[in-house]
Amino acid sequence: MQAYVAQGTGCSAFPFAICRDKKPVGFLMVGFNEAALYELDDEEPPASLKGNYSIWRLMIDKKYQNRGYGREAIRLALDFIRTWPCGKAEFCEISFEPENEVAGALYRSCGFVENGEKDGDELVAVLKL
């Protein structure tokens, strides 16, 4: 739904399947935010979101977690982002639930740093591109 809603709002969405031997094991979606999706729901977007790339979704099937697929997917997503498909940007941001310590640790290990902003109830972390 998020990729569909992004069309026509000034945002671009790039969905990717995460596969092992041609079998899907997860999903990742990159977004670029020119005008915020938040205008649709009256929330003020985090400042780091405007004019920057985001990893909107990262999901790995439970059977394939703790095998490096998430870390590799993030690395490949950042490689893709650095081709500047929507133009240059300063940051890539990602957000996560505060109680999801595993996600927070993964994102920090990939270079993301929490910046004190929140996206709804989620913590925002950014990586300088």
Description of each model-found segment:
Residues 1-63, 74-76, 80-86, 116-119:
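Acetyl-CoA-dependent GNAT
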Residues 32-34, 59, 98, 111, ...:
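Short, well-ordered turn and helix-capping elements at secondary-structure junctions
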Residues 61-63, 67, 98-99:
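Active-site acidic-Proline motif in GNAT/NAT acetyltransferases
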Residues 68, 86, 111:
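Short glycine-rich hinge loops at helix-strand junctions in the catalytic core
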Residues 71, 97-116:
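Conserved active-site alpha-helix within GNAT-family acetyltransferase domains
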Residues 88-104, 120-123, 128-129:
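Conserved beta-strand-loop-alpha-helix junction that forms the acyl-donor binding cleft
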